[in-house]
């Protein structure tokens, strides 16, 4: 996997009933690069992220994580790539409310990482997102904005090559939104590529470039 092409897509198309949601879509992201996906609600930004992450299959085209064709490999290989290469920050947080904050962070344990290293990463990640010292709190007792910060901290612990973030600052208060942005920037500075679907002008300005979905790709 080269720095010049951590994740790429070629000729992607996705149909919603008889309508093409998008078609002929190409993109490439490299190390430390941020790509913002823009477009109106319903344009298919979230669907595109799921296709790029191997969660959903596009109707046309290919997605490569490095040199691996993500949708034409055995499920076990795709799971390994999602564990070690791709990180996700989705709108629903994907937080287990009954678990502690720390347990939610440790659920993503990359291959070869010891428990001691995982714990150290978790402490550092919580400091970055402004939740230092709260690892023993039950995640379900946190506010929605704080839970989104935990989701970002979890990706900081994982340290993936590519981060896929779906409206990570939507409906957050100013403090939580800024902490989420800070966490995403820490990921970029550590070497991750970031693809973020967003309406947040701050995130669009932060990105190296943007791609308008639902305009030139139909």
Language-model-detected regions and their locations in the chain:
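Conserved ABC transporter NBD signature motif
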Residues: 61-69
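Catalytic Walker B motif of ABC-type/P-loop ATPase nucleotide-binding domains
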Residues: 163-166
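Conserved ABC ATPase signature
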Residues: 138-142, 146
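ABC ATPase NBD coupling module
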Residues: 70-86, 189
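Conserved signature/switch motifs of ABC ATPase nucleotide-binding domains
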Residues: 113, 137, 157-158, 190
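Helix-to-loop junction immediately C-terminal to a conserved catalytic motif
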Residues: 53
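ABC-type ATPase nucleotide-binding domains, specifically the catalytic core motifs of the NBD
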Residues: 106-119, 128-129
